[in-house]
Amino acid sequence: MSRFLVRLSTVVSKGATGKSVLPQKRIFAGIRLISSSTGLQSLTRYDQSTDWQRKLSPEQYVVTREKGTEVPFSGIYLNHNEVGMYHCVCCDSPLFSSEAKYDAGAGWPSFCEAHGTWEKDESHANIVRRPDNSLGSTGTEVICKHCDAHLGHVFEDGPDPTGQRFCINSVALNFKPREK
């Protein structure tokens, strides 16, 4: 393990900028390097230097980067029924299959499971769940595993067999139809 950490710090230091050569505070959290310097970047995540405000529309930016929520019943994918895959608008990771989409009547596109889920195991899915207390009650936020984009929330009031309702903002998604 120590050889791995030495090798990891060598790889990271080769990409260091002038600012990051100065002494800095580093914390190893699993394989992800977290640094107080702007010169170091995560080895497992989307490029942190991405200019999201330039890449995204204002509404996409507010929802995905500032944890906003689009107006209910306004999203382009709410009543969308085409067969295909919904991807992260920020990093293009596949998130939800149209086969898992259903009408929950909640005002946002709803899915019963994330793409890559196998018998409730989401380790191969491109989403992460996080506790969210921002609305005054405990909920579960859904974010993109690769770029930390806020996607929406998940609730335990969905249909069988999963019992889950992923309530996802349309502006956080791009749809790609299935090739024929």
UniProtKB/Swiss-Prot annotation:
User: One Pfam family of this protein, by short name?
Assistant: SelR
* One of the record's GO cellular component terms: cytoplasm
Where does it primarily localize?
A: mitochondrion
Recorded hits in SUPFAM superfamilies, A to Z, give: Mss4-like (SSF51316)
What catalytic activity is recorded?
A: L-methionyl-[protein] + [thioredoxin]-disulfide + H2O = L-methionyl-(R)-S-oxide-[protein] + [thioredoxin]-dithiol; [thioredoxin]-disulfide + L-methionine + H2O = L-methionine (R)-S-oxide + [thioredoxin]-dithiol
Q: Does the keyword Transit peptide apply?
A: yes
Keyword list, A-Z: Metal-binding, Mitochondrion, Oxidoreductase, Transit peptide, Zinc
Top class in the EC scheme: oxidoreductase
Q: Give its localization.
A: Mitochondrion
Q: What is its EC number?
A: 1.8.4.12, 1.8.4.14
Q: Where is the transit peptide?
A: 1-41
Q: Which residues bind Zn(2+)?
A: C88, C91, C144, C147
- Which GO molecular function annotation, any one, does this entry have? actin binding
Q: Which note does the record give on the cofactor?
A: Binds 1 zinc ion per subunit.
Q: Where is the active site?
A: C167 (nucleophile)
Domain MsrB spans what residues?
49-178
- Required cofactors, per record? Zn(2+)
An annotated GO BP: protein repair
Q: Which family does it belong to?
A: Belongs to the MsrB Met sulfoxide reductase family.
Function, as annotated = Methionine-sulfoxide reductase that specifically reduces methionine (R)-sulfoxide back to methionine. While in many cases, methionine oxidation is the result of random oxidation following oxidative stress, methionine oxidation is also a post-translational modification that takes place on specific residue. Upon oxidative stress, may play a role in the preservation of mitochondrial integrity by decreasing the intracellular reactive oxygen species build-up through its scavenging role, hence contributing to cell survival and protein maintenance.
Q: Report what the protein is called.
A: Methionine-R-sulfoxide reductase B2, mitochondrial
Q: Which organism is it from?
A: Danio rerio (Zebrafish)
